[in-house]
Regions:
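Juxtamembrane intracellular "pre-TM" segments in multi-pass secondary transporters
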Residues: 7-16, 200-227, 251-254, 431
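C-terminal ends and interior cores of transmembrane alpha-helices
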Residues: 95-108, 300-318
Length: 431
């Protein structure tokens, strides 16, 4: 333990102290681009030509195709990134999902969109293991929640930028060119990152340590519990980001231009969660609360902040502004919660396995996305047919609120203490 602590303190004391903020900015921008690609399809199909060929249930199935790929890719992307290193692994992920995003411009049928969404999911899954590994290389333990919040705020910023940008591009230049323009931005990031990023010398040796097999990692109680919790927790955020455009169109009759300006509001609020979630944990750590306990206190508070608005919101929403406020509070809770859960892997496993652990855990997120995106699409179509869209979405809101409580309970009560696994550390230290 002393050895690890001393190694981490070198990150702060060395000349790389300032450079680490440059490096985390790469992860932030990559996450923004990740969400621009992810949400472009969501808003372009909210109404207009693409809405005509992609109804609610088909949209749910196409979203599930993305998450099937996301789940499959997460099963191995973390191990590939741990093996290849952050620079090569992150670059390959960006190149793959950017190319898949551009190819959307060639799609003409729901099946073709589903195929390209599947390919997008394969590439996008690599963003989070890459960023988690980057943080473990550049930031000490007490700052990882804050660093995680900074890079993960890219998801909220991307979700903020996406509605007006995609609405403007889509209405001005058409949906095909929209996919192409976003892709060009990804290639620009790739070129700059490739010639800038490097791994600090002090962690190169550890980064080249033995790769821990996935089954060995899953035997760790915290890793398996984190994976299980993400099956229920992450799909709540996916619902907010994937369905907000259709929700505003279906329930309130908004067009793409209006959606573009108002759909970003919940994500502006959620963006504060990324930063404040990490800063809150850092603050109570400075007050003397042990790091593991501080993280669990934070996830408990912010997990409830996520669940309760969805459970109670349908009973108080009386218009689109009220709906946006409910989604904003829930989104804030999720991002603050995530800023802390992303810091857990480096507290439990060796740095050489952080990407692998997050990849494994994200398999759970992908599995939840596959299951609950399909269920959402079918439920909304059937309930809106038999009743109306307001009742349909209210039922789905409540369902996701209960899911958030389940995911939170698993993380708090089934994962055990957050302590470094000595057996795994000994495994990577073997010659």
């Amino acid at each position: 333990m002393r050895k690890n602590s001393g190694s981490e303190s070198l990150i702060v004391r060395s000349g790389s102290s300032g450079m680490r903020w440059v490096m985390i900015s790469f992860a932030f921008v990559a996450t923004v681009l990740n969400y621009l690609h992810r949400l472009s399809f969501t808003y372009l199909t909210a109404n207009g030509y693409l809405r005509g060929i992609i109804p609610d249930d088909t949209f749910g199935y196409i979203a599930s195709a993305f998450f099937i790929a996301y789940m499959i890719s997460n099963a191995f992307s973390g191990f590939v990134i741990d093996k290849l290193g952050t620079r090569i692994g992150y670059s390959l992920s960006m190149a793959f999902w950017t190319t898949a995003g551009i190819l959307h411009a060639l799609a003409l049928t729901p099946f073709q969109f589903g195929f390209f969404r599947f390919m997008l999911g394969i590439g996008e899954a690599g963003n989070w293991p890459s960023a988690i590994k980057l943080i473990s290389e550049w930031f000490p333990s007490n700052e990882r929640s804050t660093a995680s919040g900074i890079f993960n705020s890219g998801a909220s910023v991307g979700a903020v930028v996406a509605p007006p940008l995609i609405a403007w591009l889509g209405t001005t230049y058409g949906w095909q060119l929209t996919f192409v323009v976003i892709g060009v931005l990804g290639y620009l990031w790739l070129a700059i990152f490739w010639f800038t990023y490097y791994t600090p010398k002090k962690v190169i040796k550890e980064a080249k340590a033995r790769i821990i097999p996935p089954l060995k990692l899953l035997k760790n109680r915290f890793v398996s519990g984190l994976t299980l919790s993400k099956i229920f927790m992450d799909p709540v955020w996916y619902f907010i980001t994937f369905w907000i455009g259709r929700y505003l169109a279906d329930v309130y009759g908004w067009n793409l231009a209006k959606i573009g300006w108002f759909a970003m509001l919940p994500f502006i609020v959620a963006d504060f969660g990324n930063i404040l979630g990490g800063l809150f944990t850092q603050w109570i750590i400075k007050k003397g609360v042990p790091i593991p306990k501080a993280r669990k206190i934070a996830v408990g508070i912010f997990g409830l902040t996520m669940a309760l608005p969805l459970l109670l919101g349908p009973f108080v929403i009386n218009g689109p502004i009220g709906a946006l406020i409910v989604l904003a509070i829930a989104g804030f809770g999720y991002t603050a919660y995530s800023a802390n859960t992303m810091a857990f892997p480096a507290d439990v496993v060796p740095k050489s396995a952080t990407a692998s652990v997050w990849g494994i855990a994200s398999v759970g997120a992908g599995l939840g996305g596959v299951i609950f995106q399909s269920i959402s699409g079918v439920a909304i179509k059937n309930l809106s047919t038999n009743f109306d869209y307001e009742i349909a979405y209210s039922a789905v809101f409540i369902g996701y609120g209960f899911m958030a409580l389940i995911g939170l309970s698993i993380l708090l009560f089934l994962t055990g203490p957050v302590v470094r696994d000595k057996e795994l550390q000994e495994y990577v230290d073997q010659d």
